[in-house]
């Protein structure tokens, strides 16, 4: 594997173990060129998925982008990073097992919304503000009010 520091082509695996959720293998590597250490993750990919954007563009599904979006919504919230990882894994598996090779971005966003709703209400509202394209403070108020009402009812 190419070193991210010096671009040397060879590295040696020093340690290998499964992640906490068992969905990936974490490998500690050491570059044979510069001696730097870095970590890689190996994940199972059932098949290549394409996300269809609202404007019709197509992008290859990128798990890191999904995980980053969830992490941004959860920033400065008491959410364990392992739970973010598990949510991303669950969404990825749901997408991969859907039977379709293409999935609308809106469907992915809906899955994230569902997952965040169960994870953290503030993260849920943060994500919704982008996903639902809130334009004014009133949009936040209305949505947060609905979330608050649902929390009291359920």
Curated annotation (Swiss-Prot):
ZnF locations on chain (unnamed): 3-34
GO biological process: negative regulation of DNA-templated transcription
Region (Disordered): 1-22
UniProt biased composition (Basic and acidic residues): 7-22
InterPro entries to which the protein is assigned, alphabetical: ATP-cone_dom, NrdR-like_N, RNR_NrdR-like
Record domain ATP-cone: where: 49-139
Record family assignment: Belongs to the NrdR family.
Name of the molecule in the record: Transcriptional repressor NrdR
Species, as recorded: Rhizorhabdus wittichii (strain DSM 6014 / CCUG 31198 / JCM 15750 / NBRC 105917 / EY 4224 / RW1) (Sphingomonas wittichii)
